[in-house]
C-alpha cells in the first residue's frame, strides 16, 4: 500500500510532471523514502529511489565540509587569503587580495556572483573550467569591500573548490569521493565527471541531461537517500568532520549594513539558513537548511536536531512544487497521528469537478483541467475546518462542501455520484457533438456550447462544454444517466452550487441539450468547399482549410478546432487563419 506521504505528494504535483523524490532519515535510518514519475519523457522509464537529481547549491555544503576538513587537519585556516593559496586568482579590483576562505563560504566576498558561461552544460566532456573562471574574474571588479555584507555568491564556492583541489593536489571530484562519499557509502553521490550508470540521472521532460562543471557551488548529483546519509554527519560525531567544524558551519556568519535585515545574517558556512524557524511547523532549535536550484531542478536539505532527522527532496521544475514548504509538510505528515477526518473524493459543483485529498492535517484541492488534476489550494486542519494561507476555509456538512471567503460562508459543491455505464453510453464517451442550430446573431455559441462531449472521470459522468478558450464561461456539467437516451444534472447544492440544470437526451440520432441541437462527429461528412444552403450545415475539416466561403448578410461561419473549441467566428472581427483539422458550421 502506498504510504500517505507519497499520496500527498502525488496530489500536489502538476499532472505533466517528470519526477520527484524524497527521503527522511531518523536516528541514522531511512524511515520513509519514495520516488514518483519517470527518468525522462523520452523513454518514460519509471523512476526509483536509486535515481539521482542535480541538487545544485546543496553542493555548497559538501564543498564547505571539504574546506573544514583542511582546517581540521591544519592545512589551511578560514582567515587565510584566497590569493595566497591561489596566486593564479587575480582581479582588476585590488581589493580581491582581502578575500578570505571564510568569506567565500559565508557569501561576503564581494565577488560578482556567478560565472555563467558553462555553468550548466549538456556534456560530460571535461574542459578547463577553472581557466574560464579565472579569466572571467581577472576582468571583473568587486561589488563591495570584502566582508561588508553577505549576498548569494556562486563564485566564492568555485574559488573554495579550487582551494580544495590545490591543497589536496587532486581533482575536486576525487576529493569528494575519497574524503566523503566512499566513507558514508553514498554510491549514488557524484559530480558530473563521476556519474555512475547504476544511478541514472533524471532529466526534466525531453530536455537534455544537465551537467555542472561548477562542482563546488552546484555540481553534486545524488539520490535522496544518499543525501540523507550526508546530512546525518551533522547529527552525530563522525570521523569525516569535527564537532568544532560543524559548530562553526552552523554559526551565523552572514553580515549586513542594514539594521533590520534578518536575511543576510542567516548565512552560515555553506548553510543557507542557520536560524531556521517556520511559523507553521515546530521543528525546534538548531535547524539547518540549504536549497538548490538549477535550470531544471529544485532541491532541499533540512537537518532537524529535535527529531534527530534529515529531510531531503528534489524535483524537476515541471512538478510545480514550493520545495521548502513541501518538504516540511511531507515530514509533518509523516510525524502526525491518523486522527483526522477524511473527506477525500470527487466533488461536483455548477462549473465542473474538484478532487479533495485529505491526508492527516493536509487538504489538497485539485481542479479538473484538460491536462488532468491541478492543485488549486492547499489547506491545514484545525477545529473541524481546513484553512489556507489566505484565511479562506473549507468544511463539510454531510456530503456537501462549504467554503468561507471574506467571512461569507456558502455551499459550493457536493459529493459526486459514481455510476457504471452500459455499452450504449460508453460508446458516446469522448466524442465531439457539434452544434447544429445556432443562429447568425447568437452570442452564446461564440463563448460556450459550440460543441459538447461526454466524459467519465473516476466513475463520474459529466458533459464537457467547449467554447471560446480565451474567455471560458463554463467547463462542464456533472450528470447521471437515466436510461439509454436520457441523462440529467443531479446537483442540488444551495446558493450557486446547482444553478444551471441540463438534461441531455438523444432522439432520431441527434443530441438535444441546453436548447441546442448537436450532431455527433461520426455522422458529419467531410468539407469539400460546400457553400451555404437554406439550412445550417456542419462539416468535418480533414484537410487544411485555406479559404472560407463568401459570407453574405444574415449568415455566419464558425470554425472549431479538432478539440471542439471555437477557432474562428465571423461574428468577431479577427481575420481567419488556415486550420488543418476541425469542424466548420455554415449558419
Residues covered by each model-derived region:
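Catalytic loop of the DD-peptidase/beta-lactamase superfamily, centered on the K-T-G motif
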Residues: 1-35, 177, 210-587
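Active-site donor-binding loop signature of nucleotide-sugar glycosyltransferases
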Residues: 38, 88, 315
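Glycine-rich, histidine-containing beta strand-loop boundary motifs that form or position
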Residues: 80-82, 108, 176, 314
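Secondary-structure transition/hinge residues
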Residues: 13, 71, 75, 90, ...
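Hydrophobic alpha-helical segments typical of transmembrane helices
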Residues: 8, 66, 100, 133, ...
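Short active-site loop at a secondary-structure junction
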Residues: 4, 11-23, 42-104, 143-155, ...
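Short, surface-exposed loop or secondary-structure junction motifs
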Residues: 29, 35, 40, 94-301
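Conserved hydrophobic/aromatic "anchor" residues
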Residues: 32, 53, 85, 172, ...
